[in-house]
Amino acid sequence: MARLIWLTGPSGSGKDSLLDALRAAPPPRLLIAHRYITRAADAGGENHVALTETEFDRRAALGLFAVSWEAHGFRYGIGCETEQWLLRGQNVVVNGSRLHLAQAQARFGSQLLPVCLQVTPAVLAARLRQRGREDEAEIARRLARAAQPQPDGCLILNNDGALAETVCQLRQILELHQ
């Protein structure tokens, strides 16, 4: 059975780096889904399809998102094309949201494989400061949010160390859960 890997983790945990590493050397039968976001394409961060609020509303009204949510002042959508990829036997990794995991579970059922990327608070704080997008108050809020318990059934993947180690661990998880 093809799986939808719902990758979550706090901002700064390394989700984008992990997805970039998978894109560079993808395992067989694995696709990395892009997200539709109401954020400029050149805003930095992940490779995504930038939509205006109006475009996002129109696509949502047409049922073109399998899952969508709002966070940090932006709207995010995972396109229905991911369901076609799954039907064709491809595993799909998406940059998901732990707060919207239940919505993804309702849509994808047993095909969903939630993976939660974690880093220690000290590493997370250092990464957030290094990227320079948040002030100290926002960093404190993100650290508090990251300290909340992970959802039940989420496989934990630590990313404190070298990215290559995390990629290797994720590949092992994918092999075990096919």
Curated annotation (Swiss-Prot):
GO terms for molecular function: ATP binding; ribose 1,5-bisphosphate phosphokinase activity. It catalyses: alpha-D-ribose 1,5-bisphosphate + ATP = 5-phospho-alpha-D-ribose 1-diphosphate + ADP. GO terms for biological process: 5-phosphoribose 1-diphosphate biosynthetic process; organic phosphonate metabolic process. Its EC number is 2.7.4.23. Pfam families: AAA_18. InterPro entries: GK/Ca_channel_bsu, P-loop_NTPase, PhnN. It is an enzyme of class 2 (transferase). The keyword Lipid metabolism does not apply. ATP binds at G9, P10, S11, G12, S13, G14, K15, D16. Catalyzes the phosphorylation of ribose 1,5-bisphosphate to 5-phospho-D-ribosyl alpha-1-diphosphate (PRPP). Belongs to the ribose 1,5-bisphosphokinase family. This is Ribose 1,5-bisphosphate phosphokinase PhnN. It comes from Pantoea vagans (strain C9-1) (Pantoea agglomerans (strain C9-1)). The gene is phnN.
